[in-house]
Amino acid sequence: MALQRTFSIIKPDAVAKNVIGEITTRFEKAGLRVVASKMVQLSEREAAGFYAEHSERGFFKDLVAFMTSGPVIVQVLEGENAVAKNRELMGATNPKEAAPGTIRADFAVSIDENAVHGSDSEASAAREIAYFFAATEVCARIR
């Protein structure tokens, strides 16, 4: 097992439902440590830049509109196999297909408003973390 960092977004729908603490608690109970966290209101430019890989997809405009519809929580999580662990906790992208007890099964209502985002690889995590956090904003958790 390897100590990794991954990136997480608690999306506008989950922030509006006031379940930020419940979601973060799930990360922590699974052995992931929050090493950076902040609430941000994404601009269209920021959201479009973050999701640029989807810019040619039919859902892109709706995705950008959703991600700018309210504040989000961006976080860096650290732990053993953090990328895979976070993806397991989130559940399937479509909450109707997500296993019971996963974040999306419990808090999401649709594939479009699915509560959370998580990096899909270590390379994506590094890129996504750098998009939102300066190196000085990510804190070592040695205690």
Curated annotation (Swiss-Prot):
Q: Which GO terms describe its biological process?
A: CTP biosynthetic process; GTP biosynthetic process; UTP biosynthetic process
Q: Where does ATP bind?
A: K11, F59, R87, T93, R104, N114
SMART domains cross-referenced by the UniProt entry: NDK
Query: Which keywords belong to this entry?
Result: ATP-binding, Cytoplasm, Kinase, Magnesium, Metal-binding, Nucleotide metabolism, Nucleotide-binding, Phosphoprotein, Transferase
Assigned EC number: 2.7.4.6
InterPro entries linked to this entry:
NDK-like_dom (IPR034907), NDK-like_dom_sf (IPR036850), Nucleoside_diP_kinase (IPR001564), Nucleoside_diP_kinase_AS (IPR023005)
Annotated protein name in UniProt: Nucleoside diphosphate kinase
Species name for this entry?
Stutzerimonas stutzeri (strain A1501)
